[in-house]
Protein backbone atom coordinates (compact mmCIF):
# COMPACT_ATOMS: atom_id res chain seq x y z
CA UNK A 1 0.00 0.00 0.00
CA UNK A 2 1.44 3.43 -0.94
CA UNK A 3 2.05 5.94 1.86
CA UNK A 4 -0.72 8.46 2.54
CA UNK A 5 -0.44 11.70 0.60
CA UNK A 6 0.04 13.69 3.82
CA UNK A 7 3.04 11.53 4.68
CA UNK A 8 4.59 12.58 1.37
CA UNK A 9 4.20 16.26 2.18
CA UNK A 10 5.03 16.16 5.88
CA UNK A 11 7.38 18.97 6.77
CA UNK A 12 5.70 21.09 4.14
CA UNK A 13 2.92 23.64 4.44
CA UNK A 14 -0.08 21.57 3.35
CA UNK A 15 -0.60 19.49 6.53
CA UNK A 16 -0.62 22.63 8.69
CA UNK A 17 -3.06 24.28 6.30
CA UNK A 18 -5.34 21.25 6.33
CA UNK A 19 -5.34 21.15 10.13
CA UNK A 20 -6.09 24.86 10.58
CA UNK A 21 -8.68 25.01 7.81
CA UNK A 22 -10.52 21.93 9.08
CA UNK A 23 -10.60 23.34 12.61
CA UNK A 24 -11.97 26.62 11.23
CA UNK A 25 -14.72 24.83 9.32
CA UNK A 26 -15.63 22.95 12.51
CA UNK A 27 -15.69 26.31 14.33
CA UNK A 28 -18.15 27.60 11.73
CA UNK A 29 -20.40 24.59 12.39
CA UNK A 30 -20.20 25.34 16.12
CA UNK A 31 -21.27 28.95 15.51
CA UNK A 32 -24.21 27.67 13.43
CA UNK A 33 -25.26 25.33 16.26
CA UNK A 34 -24.93 28.16 18.79
CA UNK A 35 -27.14 30.31 16.55
CA UNK A 36 -29.80 27.61 16.53
CA UNK A 37 -29.61 27.22 20.30
CA UNK A 38 -29.96 30.97 20.82
CA UNK A 39 -32.98 30.99 18.48
CA UNK A 40 -34.61 28.25 20.56
CA UNK A 41 -33.75 29.87 23.90
CA UNK A 42 -34.94 33.32 22.80
CA UNK A 43 -37.89 31.97 20.76
CA UNK A 44 -36.86 34.10 17.79
CA UNK A 45 -37.41 32.28 14.52
CA UNK A 46 -36.80 33.47 10.97
CA UNK A 47 -39.56 31.40 9.36
CA UNK A 48 -43.28 31.23 10.20
CA UNK A 49 -43.32 27.43 10.08
CA UNK A 50 -40.58 27.29 12.72
CA UNK A 51 -42.39 29.83 14.89
CA UNK A 52 -45.65 27.86 14.63
CA UNK A 53 -43.86 24.70 15.71
CA UNK A 54 -42.49 26.49 18.79
CA UNK A 55 -45.52 28.38 20.06
CA UNK A 56 -47.01 30.62 17.40
CA UNK A 57 -46.45 33.25 14.77
CA UNK A 58 -45.58 35.84 17.43
CA UNK A 59 -42.21 34.08 17.65
CA UNK A 60 -41.40 34.84 14.01
CA UNK A 61 -39.26 37.78 15.01
CA UNK A 62 -35.75 39.08 15.24
CA UNK A 63 -33.61 39.15 18.37
CA UNK A 64 -30.40 41.05 19.11
CA UNK A 65 -28.55 37.95 20.32
CA UNK A 66 -29.62 35.88 17.30
CA UNK A 67 -28.59 38.75 15.03
CA UNK A 68 -25.19 38.85 16.76
CA UNK A 69 -24.69 35.12 16.09
CA UNK A 70 -25.71 35.58 12.46
CA UNK A 71 -23.26 38.47 12.04
CA UNK A 72 -20.47 36.37 13.56
CA UNK A 73 -21.29 33.54 11.15
CA UNK A 74 -21.45 35.91 8.17
CA UNK A 75 -18.10 37.40 9.14
CA UNK A 76 -16.68 33.87 9.25
CA UNK A 77 -17.90 33.26 5.72
CA UNK A 78 -16.43 36.57 4.54
CA UNK A 79 -12.99 35.72 5.92
CA UNK A 80 -12.61 31.96 6.20
CA UNK A 81 -13.70 31.13 2.65
CA UNK A 82 -11.00 33.38 1.13
CA UNK A 83 -8.48 31.89 3.58
CA UNK A 84 -9.35 28.40 2.34
CA UNK A 85 -8.46 29.42 -1.21
CA UNK A 86 -5.42 31.52 -0.36
CA UNK A 87 -3.94 29.01 2.08
CA UNK A 88 -4.42 26.11 -0.32
CA UNK A 89 -2.73 27.87 -3.24
CA UNK A 90 -0.01 29.31 -0.98
CA UNK A 91 0.78 25.79 0.27
CA UNK A 92 1.80 24.81 -3.25
CA UNK A 93 4.17 27.75 -3.73
CA UNK A 94 6.79 25.94 -1.67
CA UNK A 95 6.90 28.38 1.23
CA UNK A 96 9.20 27.86 4.19
CA UNK A 97 7.21 25.39 6.35
CA UNK A 98 7.67 27.39 9.56
CA UNK A 99 6.60 30.66 7.92
CA UNK A 100 3.57 28.95 6.36
CA UNK A 101 2.61 27.41 9.70
CA UNK A 102 2.82 30.84 11.32
CA UNK A 103 0.56 32.30 8.61
CA UNK A 104 -2.02 29.58 9.25
CA UNK A 105 -1.72 29.72 13.04
CA UNK A 106 -2.05 33.51 13.21
CA UNK A 107 -5.16 33.38 11.04
CA UNK A 108 -6.63 30.52 13.07
CA UNK A 109 -6.00 32.20 16.42
CA UNK A 110 -7.27 35.55 15.15
CA UNK A 111 -10.52 33.97 14.01
CA UNK A 112 -10.95 32.12 17.29
CA UNK A 113 -10.45 35.32 19.31
CA UNK A 114 -12.77 37.18 16.93
CA UNK A 115 -15.56 34.66 17.47
CA UNK A 116 -15.16 34.65 21.25
CA UNK A 117 -15.12 38.46 21.24
CA UNK A 118 -18.20 38.64 19.01
CA UNK A 119 -20.34 36.07 20.78
CA UNK A 120 -19.03 37.00 24.22
CA UNK A 121 -19.67 40.72 23.64
CA UNK A 122 -16.11 41.60 24.70
CA UNK A 123 -15.11 45.23 24.89
CA UNK A 124 -13.86 47.05 21.84
CA UNK A 125 -11.35 46.93 20.21
CA UNK A 126 -10.82 43.21 20.94
CA UNK A 127 -12.91 42.00 18.00
CA UNK A 128 -11.54 44.48 15.47
CA UNK A 129 -7.94 43.78 16.53
CA UNK A 130 -8.53 40.03 16.16
CA UNK A 131 -10.05 40.63 12.73
CA UNK A 132 -7.10 42.76 11.63
CA UNK A 133 -4.49 40.32 12.95
CA UNK A 134 -6.22 37.47 11.10
CA UNK A 135 -6.24 39.44 7.85
CA UNK A 136 -2.49 40.10 7.87
CA UNK A 137 -1.47 36.54 6.87
CA UNK A 138 -4.22 36.52 4.23
CA UNK A 139 -2.85 39.72 2.71
CA UNK A 140 0.66 38.27 2.83
CA UNK A 141 -0.41 35.04 1.13
CA UNK A 142 -2.42 36.92 -1.50
CA UNK A 143 0.54 39.15 -2.36
CA UNK A 144 2.87 36.15 -2.63
CA UNK A 145 0.40 34.32 -4.87
CA UNK A 146 0.02 37.37 -7.13
CA UNK A 147 3.81 37.79 -7.26
CA UNK A 148 4.40 34.15 -8.18
CA UNK A 149 1.64 34.20 -10.78
CA UNK A 150 2.97 37.42 -12.32
CA UNK A 151 6.50 36.01 -12.46
CA UNK A 152 5.25 33.04 -14.46
CA UNK A 153 3.23 34.92 -17.09
UniProtKB/Swiss-Prot annotation:
Please give the Gene Ontology molecular function terms for this protein. Answer: glutathione binding; glutathione peroxidase activity; glutathione transferase activity; prostaglandin-D synthase activity; prostaglandin-E synthase activity
Residue numbers on the Lumenal membrane side: 1-13, 92-96
The EC designation for this entry is: 5.3.99.3, 1.11.1.-, 2.5.1.18
Instruction: List the Cytoplasmic topological domains.
Output: 43-61, 121-124
Keyword Lipid biosynthesis assigned to the entry: answer is: yes
Tell me any Pfam family this protein matches: MAPEG
Entry keyword Transferase? yes
| GO BP, one annotated term | cell population proliferation
Q: Which reaction does it catalyse?
A: prostaglandin H2 = prostaglandin E2; 2-glyceryl-prostaglandin H2 = 2-glyceryl-prostaglandin E2; prostaglandin G2 = (15S)-15-hydroperoxy-prostaglandin E2; 1-chloro-2,4-dinitrobenzene + glutathione = 2,4-dinitrophenyl-S-glutathione + chloride + H(+)
Family named by the database record: Belongs to the MAPEG family.
Name one cellular component (GO) term: perinuclear region of cytoplasm
Q: Main role?
A: Terminal enzyme of the cyclooxygenase (COX)-2-mediated prostaglandin E2 (PGE2) biosynthetic pathway. Catalyzes the glutathione-dependent oxidoreduction of prostaglandin endoperoxide H2 (PGH2) to prostaglandin E2 (PGE2) in response to inflammatory stimuli. Plays a key role in inflammation response, fever and pain. Also catalyzes the oxidoreduction of endocannabinoids into prostaglandin glycerol esters and PGG2 into 15-hydroperoxy-PGE2.
The UniProt record gives the binding positions of glutathione as 39, 74-78, 114, 118, 127-131
* Protein location: Membrane; Cytoplasm, Perinuclear region
Q: What is this protein called?
A: Prostaglandin E synthase
Mark the transmembrane ranges: 14-42, 62-91, 97-120, 125-153
Site (Essential for protaglandin-E synthase activity) location in chain: 50, 127
Name the UniProt key words of this record, in alphabetical order: Cytoplasm, Fatty acid biosynthesis, Fatty acid metabolism, Isomerase, Lipid biosynthesis, Lipid metabolism, Membrane, Oxidoreductase, Prostaglandin biosynthesis, Prostaglandin metabolism, Transferase, Transmembrane, Transmembrane helix
Q: Which cofactor does it need?
A: glutathione
Q: How does it sit in the membrane?
A: Multi-pass membrane protein
Amino acid sequence: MPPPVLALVSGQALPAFLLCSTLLVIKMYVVAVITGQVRLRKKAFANPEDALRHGGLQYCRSDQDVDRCLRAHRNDMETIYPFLFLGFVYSFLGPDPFIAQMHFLVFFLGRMVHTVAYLGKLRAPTRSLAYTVAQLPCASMALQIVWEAACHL
